[in-house]
């Protein structure tokens, strides 16, 4: 715990070991419900299923869940923020980097406003930390969720980062638990924690932030995303989804049109690429079996015929320019083929 705290520039007591981000989010929402009478919780329109599920549970307990509107790039409308900064709002929970469309939220500004108004602020940073280490003490947030398997660590382990304010709310008041500062029950898995620590040590790069921007310094793969964007941005058959500027450095998503300018179903492109030894996806792996349109894409106000056509690429240090050139060549074939 101390070694992880040194990496993340936190105090050791800030670190709560969990099974991953989904459990961390569940702890935040459930403990909030245990300690406050039902009032308001604000989440964005493009949250991960883990946040949506926890929100729906609290809705059944009488809480009002307010979905913060996003623009057509998936970024929250900051003009709406002042509407939520009132005593009835007990929690604002925002996903930092969106897994389906890659857009980054201005969490530092949101957190600053929450702090000024004594509102608890939680950040889902599951997709972020593989791209660089941030300094917890510099972030304007009270709670932050991480999963080790997203940054090269083992499955089944994660972190809920806290501060003194949030721990006082999350702590179990009925019984003093011996583990995790009376916030989470159960014995810690030392092998998983050690694996997560090693994965954190292996992360290169640094994440810094201003009110509006997240900056990834010394990131080894951002050039791959930029290279592919340059290949695609002037192609009239490609519609990039999410923000180009404020985007995860290891992520690109888009809709591909055929030569008649009709959207090509994602599964056709995925299968074609798979036949050519390239793995891509159409959305969040946690909702891959869902036959309904992606909620995230519907919130971008896309035409209905495009809701099943979003393609998502994830880049890693093992990828190369040659692979992207091959992918681009095959993509051009898809335009003609489908």
Model-derived segments and their meaning:
Residues 1-338:
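Pyridoxal 5′-phosphate
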């Amino acid at each position: 715990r101390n070694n992880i705290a040194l990496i993340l520039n936190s105090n050791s007591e800030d670190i709560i070991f969990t099974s991953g981000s989904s459990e961390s989010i569940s702890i935040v929402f459930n403990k909030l419900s245990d300690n406050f009478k039902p009032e308001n919780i604000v989440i964005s329109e493009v949250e991960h299923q883990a946040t949506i599920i926890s929100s729906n549970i609290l809705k059944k307990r009488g809480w009002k869940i307010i979905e913060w509107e996003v623009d057509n790039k998936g970024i929250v409308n900051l003009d709406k923020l002042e509407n939520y900064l009132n005593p009835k709002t007990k929690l604002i929970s925002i996903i930092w980097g969106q897994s389906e469309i890659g857009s980054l939220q201005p969490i530092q500004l949101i957190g600053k406003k929450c702090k000024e108004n004594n509102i608890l602020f939680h950040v889902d940073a599951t997709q972020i930390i593989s791209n660089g280490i941030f300094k917890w003490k510099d972030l304007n947030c009270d709670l932050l969720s991480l999963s080790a398997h997203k940054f090269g660590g083992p499955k089944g382990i994660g972190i809920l980062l806290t501060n003194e304010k949030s721990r006082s709310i999350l702590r179990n008041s009925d019984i003093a638990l011996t583990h995790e500062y009376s916030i989470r029950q159960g014995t810690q898995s030392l092998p998983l924690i050690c694996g997560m620590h090693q994965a954190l040590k292996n992360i290169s790069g640094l994440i810094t932030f201003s009110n509006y921007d997240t900056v990834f310094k010394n990131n080894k793969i951002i050039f791959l995303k930029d290279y592919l964007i340059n290949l695609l941005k002037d192609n009239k058959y490609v519609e990039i989804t999410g923000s180009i500027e404020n985007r995860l450095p290891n992520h690109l998503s888009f809709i591909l049109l055929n030569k008649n300018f009709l959207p090509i179903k994602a599964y056709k492109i995925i299968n074609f690429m798979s036949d050519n030894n390239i793995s891509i996806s159409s959305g969040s792996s946690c909702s891959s079996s869902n036959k309904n349109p992606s909620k995230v894409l519907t919130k971008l106000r896309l035409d209905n015929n495009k809701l099943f056509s979003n393609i998502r690429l994830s880049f890693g240090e093992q990828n190369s320019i040659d692979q992207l050139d091959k992918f681009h060549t095959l993509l051009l074939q898809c335009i003609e083929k489908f």
